[in-house]
Swiss-Prot record:
Record keywords, A-Z: Cytoplasm, Methyltransferase, S-adenosyl-L-methionine, Transferase, tRNA processing
Role description: Specifically catalyzes the AdoMet-dependent 2'-O-ribose methylation of cytidine at position 56 in tRNAs.
Disulfide bond sites: none
Reactions it catalyzes: cytidine(56) in tRNA + S-adenosyl-L-methionine = 2'-O-methylcytidine(56) in tRNA + S-adenosyl-L-homocysteine + H(+)
Keyword Nucleus: no
Protein's name according to its UniProt entry: tRNA (cytidine(56)-2'-O)-methyltransferase
GO biological process: tRNA nucleoside ribose methylation
Amino acid sequence: MKRIVLLRLGHRPERDKRITTHVGLTARLLGAEGMLLASNDPGIIATLEDVVSRWGGNFYIKNNVNYKQEIKEWKAAGGKVCHLSMYGINLPDVTDELKSCDKLMIVVGAEKVPPEIYQLADWNVAVGSQPHSEVAAVAITLDRIADGEPLKREFQNAELTIVPAERGKQVIENLRD
């Protein structure tokens, strides 16, 4: 089973909470096992943990991590690092390599990322080579890597499950032990 984790850099609690939450929600939905937040924001952690509690799955969130240490440990354990931005190799040109990784850390920034990230990453990947949202970059990249498979999975231990319907909203409240 492929392991994917997202590392969020440069999160500014007062400015970026909504976007960082959406980055985490997107990563969870599209197959990442967890998110590492290289800032201190317990509110983000609480929000994402609440979603996991209600909607299921095993997504984890670590707060206030040392990004250099996390990257070092990930690579020492055989993982690869992909930094998403608007600079670098075009995503379509590197998708097959990313798909072949068993252990992939995806790095996205909020504010300007430290220049050393470009050196620490195995790939610096451009998603469109134009200004864009990090939420979009994560979504497009994870979808390309997984060929849409995460969109078909069921989240285990969910309190709530949406029933797909052409019209209307149907949510099932699941009984849990």
